[in-house]
Each structure stands twice: as structure tokens, then as C-alpha cells.
Amino acid sequence: MEADDHVSLFRFPFKIPTFRGIRKGGVYLSGALYALGFWIFLDAVLYSRYSNASDVHVTFIDWIPFLCSTLGTLIVNSIEKNRLLQGALSSDGGAFGSGVGDLDSSMAWQARTVLFFGFALLAGGLSGSIVVLIIKFLVKDYNTYPTLGMGVNNVLGNVCILLSCVVLWIAQNVEDEYSYSLTL
């Protein structure tokens, strides 16, 4: 038996990618989803500006959910998973701890708070685009495709950005077999 062969429960006719390959693929998939979401929204903006024959156009109100989703993506993906678990893994940390454990717990609390605000911006961006679709297009009876398509593109763009954020978060924080967490 060679050194590269390892015993596994199942045999597949293909090679399973390593965690490094999965991480790289996840980052690329996330970028593709963000680019797709941006292009879908930009398509609606350009259609509204140059080809739209109706009296409804994409305004700054339509941009606000997109900007919230983008800002939420930046905030969520700037937090490391290790920061979230920092206070729980320290041996000195606790409700009445002092010293380094208390500092770790404080940093973990701050990271969780910032992460909450990031996810709140993402959820607000998606729900805001749905509200814009309902109030601006459906309530005012603009339910024909080219005009309604601007609102649908806004929602689809925000969904793609949300999925991009989730894929990037998972890809960045996946544990591979060669990473070690040393705590003293």
C-alpha cells in the first residue's frame, strides 16, 4: 500500500477535493454570485434610464436596499469565526473572570454585536427590496413585465448578494485538516 492511499469507508470513482480546493471554489462562487447580483441590479438601472417607456424609474429609493446588502456583506465577512468563539474557549473567561479571559469575552461580545448588525443590514436590504417591489410596482398597478422587471431585478440582485455573503462566510471559515487551534 502506498503512502498516499488511505483507508476510507467509501470508494468514489473521482477524487474528492481538498479543503483548500473547496475554500478556493467557494470564494470564486461567492464572487460570481456577487457579480451576478450587481449585474442584475445594474441591468434594471440601465433599462430604467435608457429604454424605459413607462413613468416609473429606478431612483435612489431602489438603491438603498442594494447598498444595505453590500454594506452588510462587507461587515459580515470582515468578522473571523475565531473572534466569535474567543470568550467561550478561554479557560479564565466567565461572568466574573478577570484578566485575559475577560478581555477575550469582551472581544467576542463585540464581534457578535458587529456580526448581528451585518446580518441585520443584509436582512434589511432583502426585505427593503421586497417592500420597494410591493409598494412601488404592485400597489400602484404596474404589473406588466418590463416595468415590473425593474423591481424583480432589485429583489433578485439582493438575493444573489445575500447568497454570496453566506457562501463566502462558509468558505472563509471552513476548518481544514491542517489548521490547529492552540490555546494555553
UniProtKB/Swiss-Prot annotation:
Q: What InterPro entries would the database entry show?
A: UPF0220 (IPR007919)
Q: Which GO terms describe its cellular component?
A: endosome; fungal-type vacuole membrane; mitochondrion; Vps55/Vps68 complex
Topology versus the membrane, per the UniProt entry?
Answer: Multi-pass membrane protein
Any one GO biological process: protein targeting to vacuole
Q: What is its main location?
A: membrane
Q: Which residues carry this modification: N-acetylmethionine?
A: 1
Q: Which UniProt keywords apply?
A: Acetylation, Glycoprotein, Membrane, Mitochondrion, Phosphoprotein, Protein transport, Transmembrane, Transmembrane helix, Transport, Vacuole
Q: Where in this protein does the record say Phosphoserine is found?
A: 8
Q: What is the similarity comment for this entry?
A: Belongs to the UPF0220 family.
Protein's UniProt name: Vacuolar protein sorting-associated protein 68
Lineage here is: Eukaryota, Fungi, Dikarya, Ascomycota, Saccharomycotina
